[in-house]
């Protein structure tokens, strides 16, 4: 962006001037500078000057649209500019700046718009501008062709498109119509698309050159000399100046992206989207097939279970039938009466045999001496009667054998008398029986 050099002392205008974005951080800093709630205008002016100087040091060329160019009057003075001053501005350009060339935009082509440099900035920022090519609009594109016929205003504001917009708000609306372009080192594609859309929709359009349909090559100052910016039209070729560089460098730094490249990129994005949709559709069909197979497998498993149950039932029936046949073959050819008589005789024989065995055992036991018990089994204790009862307590005997030890006898007596008869006095309570 460029500043128009005026003989009057330069002042930073506290308004929403158009500053091309040099990135996200630069835009945020510009928004902080143009804070409408700030009360100290001198501080904001100093911040604005420092911000613009920082942009210049980084290699960018900021353009400040003065209030006279936007509104038709000066914000520093109350008196509007005279007609002679306006004519002097339009007729006599500054000596330090290069002559402005009108650029014609042919149908279906977009080109870079050149920016004139002021004399003060042409010395310090030419080396940095060789790296960062600017894509700012000319101030002449914002002015009408008939500046002499207009009374005080130089930009035709479309009031019918924006009803109810006051003059103080018109600058922001114009900036919305003209989308600010980014530098080509950041995003050339986005800048070309936004320029094409903004020039197609906005009522403010670039003037066309009179007479010659071919656009003149705009020139740009670099450290090596003048360099012509290429503008491609139907059948136009590359032009070279005195200090031109190679064709590849000119195409990379100066030529803008045409609509064919934009269309090719759009077609590529559409193709990618179609492929993505196709892949999604394939995955959906695969999932549907898997679900259908699972549904088909469930009835097959149920049929197999039913067949296994039928086979089991048949096997059980066969076993029952075989048992019934075996029972029938055993009782074939024998009357029922004979079976009952035989069974009765057998029962009688068994009963007589058991009686004889018992008698033999009793006779044998009489001749033998009685067997001694191996253990002294204590009898269960009687129920303890209270003091009110007059029934005497029955005596209990403890049978002692040679095999019984002293501890066993003591345990038996303890169970009967409920007294601890051990030689050692135990202080712990007795265990329940």
UniProtKB/Swiss-Prot annotation:
Record-listed Phosphoserine modification sites: 125
Domain of life from the UniProt record: Eukaryota
Compositional bias of kind Basic residues: 216-230, 288-306
InterPro entries per the UniProt record, alphabetical: Ccdc71/71L
Ranges in coiled-coil conformation: 260-330
Record key words, sorted: Coiled coil, Phosphoprotein
Region Disordered, annotated ranges: 204-256, 284-310, 325-396
Protein name from the UniProt record: Coiled-coil domain-containing protein 71
Species lineage: Eukaryota, Metazoa, Chordata, Craniata, Vertebrata
Gene name, Swiss-Prot/TrEMBL: Ccdc71
């Amino acid at each position: 962006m460029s500043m128009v050099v005026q003989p009057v002392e330069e002042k930073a205008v506290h308004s929403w001037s158009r500053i091309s974005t040099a990135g996200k951080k630069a835009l945020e800093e510009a928004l902080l500078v143009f804070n409408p709630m700030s009360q100290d205008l001198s501080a904001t002016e100093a911040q604005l000057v420092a911000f613009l100087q920082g942009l210049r040091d980084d290699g960018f060329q900021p353009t400040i649209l003065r209030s006279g160019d936007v509104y038709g009057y000066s914000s520093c003075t109350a008196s509007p500019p005279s007609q002679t001053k306006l004519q002097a501005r339009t007729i006599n350009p500054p000596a330090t700046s290069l002559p402005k060339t009108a650029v014609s935009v042919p149908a279906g082509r977009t080109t870079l718009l050149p920016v004139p440099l002021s004399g003060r900035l042409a010395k310090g920022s030419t080396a940095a501008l060789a790296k960062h090519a600017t894509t700012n609009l000319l101030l002449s594109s914002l002015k009408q062709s008939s500046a002499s016929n207009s009374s005080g205003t130089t930009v035709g504001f479309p009031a019918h498109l924006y009803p109810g917009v006051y003059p103080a708000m018109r600058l922001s609306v114009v900036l919305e119509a003209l989308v600010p372009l980014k530098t080509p080192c950041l995003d050339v594609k986005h800048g070309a698309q936004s320029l094409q859309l903004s020039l197609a929709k906005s009522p403010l359009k670039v003037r066309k050159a009179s007479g010659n349909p071919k656009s003149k090559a705009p020139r740009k100052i670099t450290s090596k000399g003048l360099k012509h910016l290429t503008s491609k039209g139907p059948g136009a070729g590359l032009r070279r100046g005195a200090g031109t560089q190679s064709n590849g460098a000119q195409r990379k730094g100066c030529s803008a992206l045409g609509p064919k490249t934009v269309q090719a990129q759009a077609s590529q994005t559409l193709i990618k989207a179609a492929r993505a949709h196709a892949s999604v559709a394939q995955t959906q069909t695969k999932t549907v097939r898997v679900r259908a197979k699972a549904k088909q497998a469930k009835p097959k498993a149920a049929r197999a279970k039913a067949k296994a149950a039928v086979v089991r039932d048949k096997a059980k029936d066969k076993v029952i039938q075989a048992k019934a046949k075996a029972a029938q073959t055993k009782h074939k050819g024998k009357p029922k009466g004979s079976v009952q008589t035989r069974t009765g005789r057998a029962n009688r024989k068994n009963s007589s045999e058991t009686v004889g065995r018992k008698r033999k055992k009793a006779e044998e036991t009489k001749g033998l001496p009685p067997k001694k018990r191996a253990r002294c089994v204590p009898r269960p204790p009687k129920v303890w009667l209270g003091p009110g009862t007059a029934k005497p307590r029955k005596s209990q005997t403890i049978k002692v054998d040679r095999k019984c030890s002293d501890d066993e006898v003591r345990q038996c007596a303890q169970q009967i008398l409920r007294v601890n008869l051990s030689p050692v006095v135990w202080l712990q309570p007795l265990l329940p029986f």
